């Protein structure tokens, strides 16, 4: 059965069934003009219309086709809905302004047509400049008149129409302005107006739409709900739909035609009687049952309708809906709406499966109404008896009977041809059922989606294709669909945890080999990293930077765009796009509206690259005159912007490239000027002793690569934490300002166990673990090596987000939050004489540690005020108090250490040792020297501390003592620190390192022997001194002799009775008594080792105890290991014996052996006596 297109020739229904029928006919007739025009504009803006086509299309659709009476209907549309009359003066003024705009726009479009036909004609170009200026001026003046106080809601539709026209005109000049003869500055200025006004116009419209909706009553019954729903539907079409396209006017975001889709749903009016307050459900009941909650967009497969019978009236009592998501064949079936009934066989309503006809664009409903009477017990009935569902070819699928309540009265078609002119498709049906006293209401509500939202996601090669994410077919767990903010054309997705976002199926309307780029439109209260998987094989990683604060409302200003991704190809047609968030996050929410895809066309890429470079360069500076850098612009970022500029095409934009290059060089110079570090580009390490970088010899400087444009350093791990890999520099006091905060920052490609310090009063410290990114270059990309071997920084590469937070529980080892690091330190009073400065230190003290870093900066951040100022003054005072205490303690320790050192020598020239100075005495004095604190920084023991001068003075004399001692001991390797080197061995012996870190000779067998030939001076006297220990029975012997005779020996035994040794100075009993007397080992002159090394740790407690201001500084356990500081006392049981020997020849032999048990020898000395 065919249905005539003309909505005024519908088949009438029997009005006697409903004699008091009122379906807001007046409001419907008044709103038809506004709705028709708005739908035509939406159709124009949703399609990929060329820019000139939009200009002329707006004239044909509205500004050149309607007069004062139609503008009056625009105003009446909202007047009737909100019951607010516009004063005659305000109405007439608004209509006059609209007429003036229409008239001037007619002249503008005519001038455009003439110029388009002859674009090089100077007179026509001048005429276009004149007409644009006139058009822009009248719109700037008129639009505020449509937002006058108290009439913001009634004027909202015309405000949006005028705003839409203004943005369209501003887009015209940003695209055609140069061809019209405008200079670049003027074009840029008007483009800035365009981007500034888009969010202003958008947010204004959303605000007053919501205000108007909130002013309508949300109580009562069906009539109030119908008026509320009509306002929502008609202003969605005439206001929200149009502002959802405003962002498309940005000619630099959308330089080519763009295809958009409206995924929002609208609800046509109730098709039953709405006047009787006694009939029908409450407002709240209808809103909750008729309006769907946010969901992925679905498409109707069929309706299965149940029919019930009451008092002889058959009616629609319940139904189920089956549908599918975009690109999915999976069938979705709703629960039963209403009740299940069988008064008639169940009816299945399904459109044709033929493409283009597989939808319903129109319904013709047949309502039935009978009022209940209070006098007689008549049952009140308010139901739908039948509906005709009409397809675009006007074929009808009938439920029982068709009626005359026509959905086209609310959602009209464009023109006469419904095949191409329909505006909406039926997507769903809900139902509200109510039983109240003797009244029954069964209200089906038809749900419609805009024709632009097709049932596929088709990507076309010659336009930008926008795909709302609600057109996915599967949501990830944790992803929710939420109500859109009003300007997105539909609902959006939200996620606050990592995981899969959504999956979409796309159809590619081009060869499969074509390459595409994509970008996101989103809002986020945190930084995020999105992974896009194409067909399960291609992976695109994209950074989504924070656009808003947590808890902030979603507005046009909070939504932003990512850059277009690197080019990729689809692997199949159709293909699947899976979107996920994969890196750890902290707090905040991510909202995504849509993705946009564009063919990776060379011309577009060049235009896009130029625009991106221009934005990046301009964003470096605090103002357009490039006088200063923004504080948050890092040196690394400037290098990356420089790469963008260098990669611009010489053929496409040589002049612009040169101009941008000069600006970037200027930015780099400004960055160098504010950087207080010397040699930040690592021209050398250890080049100058008193300035620049100092570092360990295993650090390497490497030239720029695909990450760093300039030199960077690599710090390897170390096998001994007491000898870390380090890099440091001091910021001189003369460069610092009093009471100022400074920041150290830079870029870390990757690191493990990298420690960063800033030291002044105390140490600010952070350990940084930055996971590496692996290769930046995807397998499908061209080689990253240039023709001369240099990194090809213009090749496509994977990106990472430098600002992502990590998420770790307390106690877990965690990656640092960013490849960009920063650490600040506060400076109090400055003193050039004291020259405290700031130490900058990088250190690695683990075997697995490593780091690659560059673009280091140390720069002034801001003056200290308030609490920060008070805190640094407090820290400075504590530091000075502790320095005074340290100075007092140092004076005491220094005096004791100097006395011990002086006692080793015979005079103040320190060129001769005392005759009885032995190795233990030197070690004891050395340990006292090492009790001087703050000789070196605890954080890095190669940096001199406040007591470095006095420490190095005494330490130098200790080294002199060791040298003099070694010079007079004619036995080589007498302390066995070099194993058995220089000794002759017979049998089995060992050199062992005991737990006191001393090497000792162990003779475990009586047949073993160790000997050494020593050259001496005949006739001179020598002292043979041995420190040893005997375990078990028998004796240990150290013998000295010449070839034929002149033999003497020292014997050691673990005995209890007195033994007498020739020429010996000590017996066993004497040794035991002496050992008890001195509570330790014995030497011929010095007290026991333990007493010599005794120190009171409490006296020399750390002077750094500050906790609240900075990290507490701790003692460096490696500091005492410098020189011979690790020499520890002998354990109890060792004894030192000596004898005098006068050789008669120039050679003697030293032999070590034992009779049984084990003989342990600590040291053997043969010392030349003084003359």
From Swiss-Prot:
An MF annotation (GO) of this entry: signaling receptor binding
Domain of life where this protein originates: Bacteria
Start-end of Basic and acidic residues biased regions: 1103-1117
Region (Disordered): 1094-1124
Annotated GO biological process: sporulation resulting in formation of a cellular spore; symbiont-mediated killing of host cell
Annotated keywords: Sporulation, Toxin, Virulence
SUPFAM superfamilies in alphabetical order: delta-Endotoxin (insectocide), middle domain (SSF51096), delta-Endotoxin (insectocide), N-terminal domain (SSF56849), Galactose-binding domain-like (SSF49785)
Further information: Toxic segment of the protein is located in the N-terminus.
Function text: Promotes colloidosmotic lysis by binding to the midgut epithelial cells of many lepidopteran larvae including Spodoptera species.
Protein name, as recorded: Pesticidal crystal protein Cry1Ea
Organism this protein belongs to: Bacillus thuringiensis subsp. kenyae
